Amino acid sequence: MACTTILVGKDASYDGSTIIARNEDSANGEFCPKRFIVVKPDEQPRHYKSVLSHVEVDLPDEPLQYTAVPNADLKEGIWGEAGVNEANVAMSATETLTTNERVLGADPFVELTPAKGKKGEDGYEPEVPGGIGEEDFLTLVLPYVKTAREGVARLGALLEQYGTYEMNGVAFSDVDEIWWLETVGGHHWIAKRVPDEAYVTMPNQLGIDEFDLDDALGNQEEHMCSVDLGEFIERNHLDLAVENVTPFNPRDAFGSHSDSDHVYNTPRAWYMQRFLNPYDEQWDGQDADHQPTADDIPWARQPDRKITIEDVKYVLSSHYQGTPYDPYGKLGDQRTRHMFRPIGINRQSQLSVMQIRPYRPQVNRAVQWIAYGSNPFNTLVPFFPNVDSTPKYLEDTTTRVTSENFYWENRIIAALCDASFADTANAVERYQEKTGAMGHRMVSTTDGQIDRLVEDVIDEFDADDETGDVQPMEPDEIIEAVRNGEAREVLAAANETMAAQLKAETDKLLDSVLYTTSMNMKNGFHMSDF
């Protein structure tokens, strides 16, 4: 999928949380209705078969419960995309990445080979399944891992065993760490821990630009990789460093810097970092330190100020506001306004922002913020993933267009607003601000309810310990603490209240923008009938 990702380390976020976020964008010319669901252990398959690649994988017993945002239409598979499990581990999968011919020549993709002929006849060749891909990743990994690091290890092992038919980037987070994994060819992979004080921007391009192979093949403190990566690089002459003392650069070795990258990928990283580090360097003009087409925009950077949930939503909704490249703007001309691929694009399916908060008890530590549809015109609102069911307004997405579920209502609103951007912009902004404030208020109020419910637990721990974690626990203890039926009922009730308020406000926005755009129709006539 064509997506955009931002990862925010705990010391770079406004409240000490780890934050991972990704737009899921459908392919050009397609829309992909999404659902927000809880997958219970008895609903998780024990034997999995991919729809696209036909690969079959036996899965462990005793999976953890987890949230997901799968397709409403399962004809191409589940595509779970984003979720949080009972160990308070979050996963976002995947960001489609680019590569190069040298990598694919050395380690080809593992693609489905259809059967030839008919079984029993001369010349028959049976089908050869492909590897695993975005369709499968969340389902195969998230229910079975108890830390972000375990997520990297499990996905890496699956990639080495089954291979993949596409290049992908995947984020994992827990309360302490964020890890970013990038696939390399058919069977190889690298992963790097996001620095606590930094954020990471990822368009659809292999991004890691500095990698410690000794650490990855040794202690794995900040880096991990497939077991034979060093030999793979050396055997296929993939390290392009001029000097031996230069840190290994995976972006040069495994990635791309094509003409299409310069209109589709690098401008997105440029705009996100331009917004989050406005004073760090010169961003505009001929003397800019980095142009939108630069191939060396850093993978990770320390922000000029702490990053909020609203900052994450803004950059993942952006269409180059304040630059000549804004398709809705008045700067530049028709050529520049359609020069680069916006981040907030028409074919956005969903945005999930997963926040793991160290200052909350384990039972309500995780928050999954959700938006559906095209980001410039939608809103991002919070839901607690530690529940046994999700609100119907977000879960019961149909393949039929209707204003009765959140996905399609947002899709309709976006189409109306695009046609009358300037005239509807104020209504959309008021809606986003109001629903965002409602979301923060819901989280705060629910936190208070949980505090009263687990007061004895909170008093037991020192909130000022060296990690800032008010309830530090081993993974198995986290799972036990999270499986609190009474707390789950409180969180589910809060989610239902949020969804009801969200629907009321979204209905009002639809009413408003439908009226405005209808009044702007080209067949209107301002003289009253007489």
Task: List where the protein language model places each region.
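Glycine-rich, aromatic-lined ligand/substrate-binding cores of catalytic
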Residues: G230-N364
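Short, charged, surface-exposed loops that flank catalytic or proteolytic processing sites
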Residues: Y144-E150
